[in-house]
């Protein structure tokens, strides 16, 4: 018999989800608790899809690149311009209030935030690289 899970609402800014390849959705502590994990743990979790939400009122402090899979960034509220370094040049995607941006794997990207924003992200983070903005 399969184990039963308790179904309850989760705040994706506090509790992230790991979508495992076996179909499981595993809740995991989010926010600073997640990002302060040892690098080896983060890399292990990066083999799954990470579903998270965060709020920001300033530009992202760094560029990032995800080599394994595309990243989905859904702006829930606010205003931001997403910068993608594509082979053909810099692409700017301006989003106000609501919109989904698909960042292709292997593309360096960052965000310039024009108004306090909430973003919902789905990322496979294994091998993610960062550099200063």
Regions found by a protein language model. Give the residues of each.
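A short, N-terminal "cap"/entry segment at the start of jelly-roll beta-barrel domains
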Residues: 1-63
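Double-stranded beta-helix
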Residues: 2-18, 26, 110-133
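Short histidine-centered beta-strand/loop micro-motifs
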Residues: 40, 60-67, 84-85, 92-93, ...
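Short, surface-exposed beta-edge/turn micro-motifs
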Residues: 48, 69-72, 117
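Short, conserved beta-strand element in jelly-roll/cupin
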Residues: 67-82, 86, 122
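A generic "binding-loop/recognition-motif" signal
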Residues: 68, 107, 115
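Structural motif
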Residues: 79-81, 99, 118
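Short acidic-glycine-tyrosine-enriched beta hairpin
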Residues: 87-105
């Amino acid at each position: 018999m399969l184990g039963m899970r308790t179904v309850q609402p989760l705040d994706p800014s506090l509790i992230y989800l790991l979508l495992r390849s076996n179909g499981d959705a595993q809740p995991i502590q989010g926010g600073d608790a997640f990002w302060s994990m040892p690098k080896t743990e983060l890399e292990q979790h990066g083999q799954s899809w990470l579903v998270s939400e965060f709020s920001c009122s300033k530009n992202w402090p760094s560029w990032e690149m995800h080599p394994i899979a595309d990243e989905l960034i859904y702006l829930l509220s606010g205003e931001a311009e997403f910068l993608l370094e594509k082979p053909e040049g810099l692409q700017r995607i301006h989003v106000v209030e609501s919109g989904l941006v698909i960042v292709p794997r292997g593309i360096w990207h960052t965000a310039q935030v024009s108004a306090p924003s909430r973003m919902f992200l789905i990322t496979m983070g294994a091998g993610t690289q960062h550099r200063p903005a």
